[in-house]
Amino acid sequence: MVPVIIIPVLNRYDLMERAIRSIDYPVERLIIIDNGDGYDPDMLAWTAPWQHIQNWYLWRMPTNLGVAPSWNLGIKSTPHADGWILMNSYAFFEPGQLEAFYKDCESDSITLTSAMPTWSCAWVGAGVVERVGLFSECYVPAYFEDNDFEDRARRINVEVKVSQAGIIHDNSSTIRSDESLADKNQRSFQENGSLHALRWQSGVPDAGAWDLKRRRDLGWD
């Protein structure tokens, strides 16, 4: 049984529902973090394959937390899990492929999908978080938090595996669906890329810290 699946979502709730409907293997906890505060929880009654999901949580945020804080919130809320599947809201499993992906997951390793981008569906084991820490919340609101975490993990010889399980991903659906988000992402993507390069100039960085000014300057709201 998959211990936890965490799905942050900002818009395109139809694609999030597609992701949930693709769950065809037992999951102990499904955590949906609604950063757009626009999803009707009653719709889950018609969407989710409840025969496979033991418990679900829909957390509606008053503003966009961003990717790293959303993943971290899901991890910190389930500290006794053996690991976590972090899934983009616009990715989905082909039939039988959640089980195939989970078979490639271990508590002391990271498992990525062979689809691009590889972090569109990723497993992070509890042993990895114990060694590496959480995702860096310096990156606002999205992009480079996955690169940063993987780089930190590889530097301390954490195994990073690639699963051949069938996972489909509609890349950048969030920003493609809203022209204003695409415009804001141009700036935040550049700033996050510059920060990523800067953080690694002096060796292996720690997880970093959330910063109010950076959040206000680069957030998409």
Feature locations, PLM:
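Short, well-formed alpha-helical segments that are part of the catalytic scaffolds
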Residues: 11-25
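Glycine-rich, basic loop-to-helix element that forms the pyrophosphate-binding segment
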Residues: 61-78
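Short beta-strand/loop segment that forms part of the nucleotide-sugar
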Residues: 28-38, 59-61
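C-terminal catalytic/acceptor-binding lobe
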Residues: 145-221
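A conserved acidic beta->alpha catalytic loop
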Residues: 22, 34-46, 91-92
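Aromatic-glycine-rich donor-binding/catalytic loop that engages nucleotide-sugar donors
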Residues: 124-143, 152-163
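Short beta-strand-to-loop acidic/aromatic patch adjacent to the donor-nucleotide binding site
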Residues: 81-92
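Conserved donor-nucleotide/metal-binding helix-loop-beta segment in metal-dependent transferases, i.e.
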Residues: 96-112
